[in-house]
């Protein structure tokens, strides 16, 4: 649970960093602010700048959103301008027209897909990706936690949509998945309740026993366990997978190590 909730503006209340978008031809787009933020809400980049200032790191963020977008416009080419994007919201990227059947251009110095990164090397990391064994090894008593999006949901953004909430309930989409072999080790049958616990926390979930998951893993969807009563359709449905995930990141990329978590499983009532 968060110690602080910061008043981030909605997507209609803040302009965005420009970015490429998929289309019949390559374009760059920028979302322009439609209305002023409500109350004390601020854009994310303003919140980050304010936090940096409070931490004595304001000099590291001594620029505005337009400065970032202007630099990106220069990188895309002379025909992409900030004024133009403020006016139209999108524009084509010169030299990036691609039609079906054409050989795509790779935007690297060599024109090829690189398998080594000089930027990683500058950061003191291996220039070429190196395999590393997982930090945890699942066994018959502690499978590995995995999670991943369900096709009809988008994170928790859509969990409160009435039709999707009803569909998720009808499908019992909130269930944790176990392979029959793994479930048998714990004396668990399809539909049983089980307690899942890690070094970080524990949750109580209904189990789906299915061959669609590896015996070494237990799956929990990331969309449920919403606690906010304001999300009336989603509140109280399923469990929050992040209650089981410790705070850890991969050294090279900073990605969260979500799948490096062994899980203890106990059938409720056993």
Where in the sequence are the language-model features?
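Short, well-ordered loop/turn elements at secondary-structure boundaries
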Residues: 1-2, 101-102, 109, 138-141, ...
């Amino acid at each position: 649970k968060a110690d602080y909730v910061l008043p981030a503006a909605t997507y209609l209340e803040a302009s965005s960093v420009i970015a490429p978008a998929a289309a019949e031809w390559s374009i760059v787009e920028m979302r322009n602010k439609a209305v002023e933020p409500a109350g004390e809400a601020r854009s994310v980049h303003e919140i980050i700048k304010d936090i940096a200032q409070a931490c004595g790191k304001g000099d590291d963020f001594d620029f505005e959103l337009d400065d970032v977008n202007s630099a990106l416009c220069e990188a895309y080419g002379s025909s992409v301008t900030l004024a133009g994007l403020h006016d139209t919201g999108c524009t084509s990227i010169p030299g990036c027209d691609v039609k079906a059947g054409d050989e795509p251009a790779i935007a690297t110095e060599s024109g090829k897909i690189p398998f080594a990164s000089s930027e990683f090397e500058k950061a003191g990391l291996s220039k070429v990706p190196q395999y590393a064994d997982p930090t945890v090894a699942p066994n018959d008593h502690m499978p590995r936690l995995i999670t991943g999006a369900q096709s009809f949901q988008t994170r928790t953004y859509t969990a409160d949509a009435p039709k999707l909430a009803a569909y998720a309930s009808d499908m019992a989409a909130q269930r944790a998945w176990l392979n029959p072999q793994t479930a048998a080790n714990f004396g668990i049958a399809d539909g049983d309740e089980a307690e899942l616990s890690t070094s970080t926390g524990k949750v109580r979930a209904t189990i789906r026993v299915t061959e669609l998951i590896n015996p070494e893993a237990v799956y929990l969807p990331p969309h449920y366990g919403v606690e906010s009563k304001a999300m009336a359709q989603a509140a109280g449905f399923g469990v929050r997978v992040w209650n089981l995930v410790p705070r850890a990141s991969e050294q090279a990329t900073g990605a969260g190590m979500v799948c490096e978590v062994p899980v203890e499983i106990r059938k409720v009532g056993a």
